[in-house]
């Protein structure tokens, strides 16, 4: 039995946890669009596809519910063309794209999340409709080309237009509409493997009447009011494809800075071809001047070199194309190397042995490259001992060699190779190489104090390799321990003095670096290498870098600072401070963290705590903000009908909120409410007293009155505790004229001034009346009507019919709901969406008549379908009704009260709701009376347990 009572207790705690969420709810989302979509009769798109004309403005709104207020994010997946939504997302309820283009079509997703449950995601597909100008191209049958291009030949006219939706084509000859089969000499067809993309008009064995003006009309059936577009082509016996010629050489070799002009002329073609210039790679230079078929580049550079093509097109046959290559002279990158006698293993230059000097440059064009050799300023010619050669361009382009056979003392001196281009206009490159007894191969060493090299993160460091020898070669630096890039992003860095300078050193740069000699500007021998070790010290990396801790007075708090990484890791010390006050110091042993605790918080214990963990390179810091400030309130945005109007120019607003983590700090004693009119500077403030503790998820309501229509107001709410002010939160409230609520969910308790947009029927006999028990006439008829609204409140409002005189039996009062709009049915999709319609009704009195509910469907003809009916005395209680409805178009609900035979026949309704989805089965099957809603959830869950206890208790 004790186990059973324990089970009851556990279940009660669980249910309290569930109900403790209060109004907190995971997000729901729905997408609506402003304006009307372009409808296609035969397509019948569902509401999840939105069609829009190119160039117009797309506006999609994401309607969300959920508490706390969900964060909204719009994203997009590509449609027919890849588009990444400008590589960004939109964090706003409304997505607005002005001048929408075709590539912006696709599926748009709205994602809402507030940390409760799973994110809510809805999508809508956007189709962008457009129609480009059609283009007609003309071709003759293959293999029949002769001088008279179209004389007694078969001709094909192809019409193409880009569009969405698919285009429909029609042909005309003059004013005559051409149809398949209307003329034996004409055939109209679509090519294989196309889907309405083109339409071909085939003229078989041209006849005299076929020489005429042809028109192709492209149409998308006026979808989105896109007009038809037409293109015409005049076919004659002179119609011919284009031909051109270039009035320039190929290739064209020029010097940098010169102006160049390319001329392209047409030699044939009817109609007259259009001429365009293109470049084989990339676009034309920005400075290019185009004038018809003439292209001018004022001051050419090496970057402008390449192949330029002139293209002529008149939509007859294939376009004509002629090309020329522009070469811009250039000489660059002069370098040399010395190769000792290859038949000896010695790398040194010695008397009596062979030595070879090589020079290399990059030349454009390579055919114009020439080399000249000099010794001590005097020209050298090839001889038996001084052999001058040029390396095969396929092996080593732009390279010349001077072989000195049997080196003699008299051969010592300065040798110069000069590279030049035959065309001139480019400065020569001169390279000097000294051959003497002091010319020796290189050697690399690392100074003793330069490896290992210790530095700190963020410093500037120089890695050094000393190079000896003559001449001194270029030094190449690279990473020796791993295949990673050097600081400049390349795999190797060049140095002319053996020094590698690194700015802003990072910890990732620690490791071994290799310096090695290059063959250029030195000896062509096996590279010399040396290694330099770099050690980068960095201060400790710690977590958390910053943490806010909110805690009430007289409570304890513990702060912990953890070391993630540090170098050097040894001799780590720490110190705790509150502001400038030193609290504690110490040294790490084997642990990776340090803690500081405050057993009982008071005013002097609040503030910023800093924990510094220190090594040779510096300090890492954890910061803790310990505060007693209350968290910000969370405004509730899902209030049903928050705006109501009591006077002509004045409106009121029901402001609701919850308190985030109310138990985190001391009890909230009041809220400071600030309000100011939009655009004004001054805040009007007042305090709202709070009695007792606020529960998590508890909804707090405060009515803002005397607001001026149609002004918007900024509202600021700040919680107050004995610590002081907490975090503020701000929202804007706006007056909006009553509109039809979104059908996702509708609830009306008739509490506001506009009674949720319900209206009286002008064709009935009398009206429904808004009333509460507290405001009803003191001369009311006894023994009929409710004593409170359906929640049990004497101040709550409901709608009722007064059946006292002069009302007569059978007279009707009809109350009309707002018009609810739904999306048109998709004939190829699922069935219509179901909605659960529910309301409370009160029928007490001996003369009760009838209460009917009708579903009025909007269309070309208005139809009223009986939905629900009840009659007779139901007792002094509120009853609930649930009905599933399946509207196929916009609809209204009509409450019709019919007066009974006497004055004790008042009928009332309250809490009308419409929710998407079918009603629960138990709701449809139950019509129980309801006196209040408090505790129902717990009582229902506990009922089986209580029954079980009552059965088992006698057995004890």
From Swiss-Prot:
It is a lipid-anchor; GPI-anchor. A lipid is attached at residue 931 (GPI-anchor amidated aspartate). Disulfide bonds join 62-110, 159-216, 264-310, 359-417, 465-515, 561-611. Keywords: Cell membrane, Disulfide bond, Glycoprotein, GPI-anchor, Immunoglobulin domain, Lipoprotein, Membrane, Repeat, Signal. CDD domains: Ig (cd00096), MAM (cd06263). Residues 932-956 form a propeptide. Gene3D superfamilies: 2.60.120.200, Immunoglobulins (2.60.40.10). Residues 746-921 form the MAM domain. Glycans are attached at residues 92, 213, 237, 434, 443, 504, 610, 703. SUPFAM superfamilies: Concanavalin A-like lectins/glucanases (SSF49899), Fibronectin type III (SSF49265), Immunoglobulin (SSF48726). Residues 1-25 form the signal peptide. Detected in Leydig cells, syncytiotrophoblast, duodenal villi epithelial cells and neutrophils from kidney and cutaneous squamous cell carcinoma (at protein level). The keyword Cell membrane applies. It is found in: Cell membrane. Its main location: membrane. GO terms for cellular component: extracellular region; plasma membrane; side of membrane. May be involved in cell-cell interactions. This is MAM domain-containing glycosylphosphatidylinositol anchor protein 2.
């Amino acid at each position: 039995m004790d186990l059973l009572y324990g089970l009851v207790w556990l279940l009660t705690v669980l249910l309290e946890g569930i109900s403790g969420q209060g109004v907190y709810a995971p997000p729901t989302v729905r997408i609506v669009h402003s304006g009307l979509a372009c409808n296609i009769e035969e397509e019948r798109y569902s509401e999840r596809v939105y069609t829009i004309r190119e160039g117009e403005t797309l506006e999609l709104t994401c309607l969300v519910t959920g508490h706390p207020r969900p964060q909204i994010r719009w994203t997009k997946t590509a449609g027919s063309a890849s588009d990444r939504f400008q590589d960004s997302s939109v964090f706003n309820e409304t997505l607005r794209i002005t001048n929408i283009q075709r590539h912006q079509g696709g599926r748009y997703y709205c994602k809402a999340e507030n940390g409760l449950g799973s994110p809510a995601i809805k999508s809508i597909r956007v189709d962008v409709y457009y129609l480009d100008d059609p283009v007609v191209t003309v071709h003759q049958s293959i293999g029949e080309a002769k001088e008279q291009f179209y004389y007694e030949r078969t001709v094909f006219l192809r019409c193409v237009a880009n569009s969405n939706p698919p285009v429909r084509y029609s042909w005309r000859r003059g004013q005559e509409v051409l149809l398949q089969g209307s003329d034996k000499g004409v055939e109209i067809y679509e090519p294989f493997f196309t889907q309405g993309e083109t339409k071909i008009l085939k003229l078989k064995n041209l006849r005299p009447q076929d020489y005429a003006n042809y028109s192709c009309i492209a149409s998308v059936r006026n979808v989105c009011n896109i007009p038809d577009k037409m293109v015409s082509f005049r076919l004659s016996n002179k119609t011919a494809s284009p031909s051109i010629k270039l009035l320039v050489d190929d290739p064209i070799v020029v010097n940098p800075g010169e102006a160049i002009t390319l001329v392209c002329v047409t030699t044939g073609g009817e109609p007259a071809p259009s001429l365009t210039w293109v470049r084989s790679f990339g676009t034309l230079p920005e400075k290019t001047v185009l004038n018809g078929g003439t292209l001018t580049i004022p001051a050419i550079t090496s970057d402008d070199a390449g192949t330029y093509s002139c293209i002529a097109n008149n939509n007859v046959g294939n376009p004509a194309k002629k090309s020329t290559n522009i070469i811009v002279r250039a000489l660059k990158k002069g370098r040399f190397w010395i190769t000792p006698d290859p038949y000896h293993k010695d790398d040194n230059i010695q008397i009596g042995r062979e030595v070879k000097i090589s020079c290399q440059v990059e030349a454009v064009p390579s055919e114009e490259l020439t080399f000249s050799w000099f010794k001590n300023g005097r020209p050298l010619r090839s001889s038996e001992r001084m052999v001058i050669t040029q390396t095969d361009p396929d092996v080593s382009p732009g390279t010349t060699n001077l072989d000195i056979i049997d080196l003699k003392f008299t051969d010592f001196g300065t040798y110069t190779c000069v590279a030049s281009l035959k065309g001139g206009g480019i400065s020569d490159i001169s390279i000097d190489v000294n051959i003497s007894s002091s010319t020796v191969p290189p050697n690399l060493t690392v100074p003793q104090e330069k490896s290992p090299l210790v530095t700190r993160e963020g410093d500037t460091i120089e890695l050094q390799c000393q190079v000896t020898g003559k001449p001194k070669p270029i030094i190449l630096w690279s990473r020796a321990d791993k295949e990673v890039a050097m600081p400049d992003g390349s795999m190797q860095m060049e140095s002319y003095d053996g020094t590698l300078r690194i700015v802003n050193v990072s910890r990732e740069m620690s490791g071994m670096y290799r310096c090695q000699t290059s063959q250029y500007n030195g000896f062509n021998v096996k590279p010399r290498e040396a290694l330099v070790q770099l050690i980068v010290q960095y201060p400790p990396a710690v977590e958390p870098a910053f943490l806010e801790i909110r805690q009430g007075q007289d409570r304890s708090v513990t702060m912990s600072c953890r070391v993630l990484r540090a170098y050097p890791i040894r001799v780590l010390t720490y110190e705790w401070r509150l502001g400038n006050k030193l609290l504690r110091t110490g040294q790490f042993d084997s642990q990776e963290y340090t803690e500081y605790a405050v057993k009982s918080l008071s005013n002097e214990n609040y503030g910023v705590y800093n924990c510094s963990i220190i090594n040779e390179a510096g300090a890492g810091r954890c910061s803790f903000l310990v505060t007693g400030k209350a968290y910000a309130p969370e405004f509730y945005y899902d209030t049903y009908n928050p705006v109501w109007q009591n006077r002509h120019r004045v409106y009121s607003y029901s402001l609701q909120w919850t308190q985030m983590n109310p138990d985190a700090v001391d009890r909230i004693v009041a809220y400071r409410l600030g309000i100011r009119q939009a655009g004004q500077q001054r805040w009007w403030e007042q305090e709202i007293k709070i009695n007792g503790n606020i529960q998590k998820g508890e909804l707090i309501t405060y009515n803002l009155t005397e607001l001026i229509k149609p002004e918007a107001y900024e509202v600021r709410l700040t919680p107050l505790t004995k610590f002081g002010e907490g975090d503020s939160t701000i929202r804007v409230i706006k007056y909006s004229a009553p509109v039809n609520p979104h059908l996702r969910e509708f609830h009306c308790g008739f509490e506001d001034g506009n009674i949720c947009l319900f209206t009286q029927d002008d064709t009935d006999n009398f009206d429904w009346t808004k009333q509460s028990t507290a405001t009803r006439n003191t001369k009311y008829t006894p023994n009929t009507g409710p004593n409170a609204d359906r929640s049990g409140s004497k101040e709550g409002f409901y709608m009722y019919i007064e059946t006292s005189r002069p009302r007569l039996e059978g007279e009707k009062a009809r109350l009309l709901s707002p018009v609810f709009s739904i999306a048109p049915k998709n004939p190829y999709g699922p069935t219509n969406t179901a909605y659960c319609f529910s309301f409370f009704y009160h029928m007490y009195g001996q003369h009760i008549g009838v209460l009917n509910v009708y579903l009025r469907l909007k269309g070309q003809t208005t139809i009223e379908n009986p939905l629900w009916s009840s009659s007779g005395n139901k007792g002094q209680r509120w009853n609930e009704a649930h009905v599933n409805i399946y509207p196929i178009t916009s609809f209204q609900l009509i409450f019709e009260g019919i007066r009974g035979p006497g004055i004790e026949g008042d009928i009332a309704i309250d809490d009308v709701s419409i929710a998407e989805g079918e009603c629960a089965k138990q709701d449809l099957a139950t019509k129980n009376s309801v006196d209040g809603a408090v505790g129902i959830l717990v009582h229902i869950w506990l009922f089986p347990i209580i029954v079980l206890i009552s059965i088992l208790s006698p057995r004890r």
